[in-house]
Amino acid sequence: MIVVDTNIIAYLFLTSDHSTQAEQALIKDPIWCAPLLWRSEFRNVLALYIRKNILSLADAHQLTNEATLLMQGREYDVASHQVLSLVAKSTCSAYDCEFVALARDLGLPLVTTDGQIISQFPDYAIPLEKYIG
């Protein structure tokens, strides 16, 4: 089991330069988890695609359903004090620190492409490219 940030989930469901790597990560470990925040962030990505006419509303609904099914049962609330503690030690956003806090709490790696998270939390975060080998 691994913690993934919203970018990794988005790469899996939306065509990008990292889509193949996200698929390889899923093959390596199909049990992904994330803070509940991933849902709102994913909807925000889909909103951008809808507004740029890259995705239809129906397609966005379908992708939301597929992503939710993938993450079902492995979405977690993260305690505010844990998030704020990490915020105080870094320049990462509280959003990013939710993913780090979950990884720390579960004792799992956080797979991400976010350079800021990787550089500020090397004990918890691992680059997607490194994770898939």
Name each region found by the language model.
Residues 1-37, 49-58:
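Short, well-structured N-terminal submotif of metal-dependent ribonuclease cores
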Residues 1, 92, 100-133:
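Acidic, PIN/NYN-like endoribonuclease modules and their adjacent C-terminal/linker elements
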